[in-house]
């Protein structure tokens, strides 16, 4: 009789735990969905507006660039090398002069 009671108790315990977890998972999922909807409502328009104002891919410092179509980042400009790089035929992105 004791063994049957232990088995029944174990089965009831397992069922209680699995059903309880299912309820918690569905509650977490619905809460996550609500938070995502609220975030989309609050920040969706802002993200869409700022997406196009972001700087496109650009070339960093000391990287070859095209004189006619420079793709240097804002703080750089496409210049012909001077000094040690005078023998190179192409232009390079260099930091803009601050003066």
From Swiss-Prot:
Oxidoreductase as UniProt keyword: no
Residue ranges the record assigns to the propeptide: 23-57
Domain of life: Eukaryota
Cysteine-cysteine disulfides: 58-73, 65-78, 72-93
GO cellular-component term (any): extracellular region
GO molecular function: sodium channel inhibitor activity; toxin activity
Keywords on record: Amidation, Cleavage on pair of basic residues, Disulfide bond, Ion channel impairing toxin, Knottin, Neurotoxin, Secreted, Signal, Toxin, Voltage-gated sodium channel impairing toxin
Transmembrane segments: none
UniProt tissue specificity: Expressed by the venom gland.
Serine amide sites (modified residues): 98
Protein location: Secreted
Residues annotated as signal peptide: 1-22
UniProt family annotation: Belongs to the neurotoxin 14 (magi-1) family. 08 (Ltx-4) subfamily.
Protein purpose: Has minor, but significant effects on the Para/tipE insect sodium channel.
Other observations noted: Negative results: has no effect of mammalian sodium channels Nav1.2/SCN2A, Nav1.4/SCN4A, Nav1.5/SCN5A, Nav1.6/SCN8A and potassium channels Kv1.3/KCNA3 and Shaker IR.
UniProt comment concerning the protein's domains: The presence of a 'disulfide through disulfide knot' structurally defines this protein as a knottin.
Identification of the protein by name: Omega-theraphotoxin-Bs2a
């Amino acid at each position: 009789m004791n063994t049957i009671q232990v088995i029944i108790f174990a089965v009831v315990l397992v069922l209680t735990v699995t059903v309880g977890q299912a309820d918690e998972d569905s509650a977490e999922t619905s809460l996550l969905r609500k938070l995502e909807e609220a975030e989309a409502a609050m920040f969706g328009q802002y993200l869409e507006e700022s997406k196009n104002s972001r700087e496109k891919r650009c070339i960093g410092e000391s990287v070859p660039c095209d004189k006619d179509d420079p793709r240097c980042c804002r703080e750089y400009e496409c210049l012909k090398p001077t000094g040690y790089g005078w023998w190179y035929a192409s232009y390079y992105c260099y930091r803009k002069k601050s003066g």
